[in-house]
Amino acid sequence: MDFLDRPTMITMLEERMKQLYEHGNADVQRLDRELKQAPNDAEMWFDLGLAHNQCGLQYLEMAFERERLLFLEQHPDAEEEPNQELTVDVPEAYAMFNAALAAFDKVLELMPDYYGVQCQRGVALGNMHRYEEAEQCYLKALEEDEEDFSAAYYLGCTYRDMGDEERASRYFALADQLNPDSTGEIG
């Protein structure tokens, strides 16, 4: 079986990244078409926000892989893989997260009490390291539903990322209390 060389893999990955950035995934494309027919459908806007957020995460994953391949190409004798932290910002992924925020804001405009939108706004903000804003979204989600274990869990993640282990622990415990059967799968 023939394997692709690293330069070819990098080129293919860059092309996939370009396609994702320019066109989104199949869900984004479908929802964009459907929203032209039903521009006031809050549920579709919510789904579009989720799809844009997912595209941003996919783009970041590809950016990590691209950086790893570039490192290995430039350091063929390296004994270990590079650290999985990007050395530069990825504005394309941030654009996708901002598109998610715009969709979630449209949901709030159409239906201010739409369940789950504050938590998902927090996820998109957290993906951009805008932790203070994410924190406010999760707190608002918990005000709206004190049993929203996803909001409690993500608030714990936000506090952990902010370096506040005490509050992180408290909200992880709350999430576990709210959903003791959870296996760590948050949606």
Language-model segments: which ranges?
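Canonical positions in the second alpha-helix
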Residues: E34, K106-V107, K140-A141, L174-A175
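Structural marker of alpha-solenoid helical repeat scaffolds
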Residues: Q37, L110, E144, Q177-L178
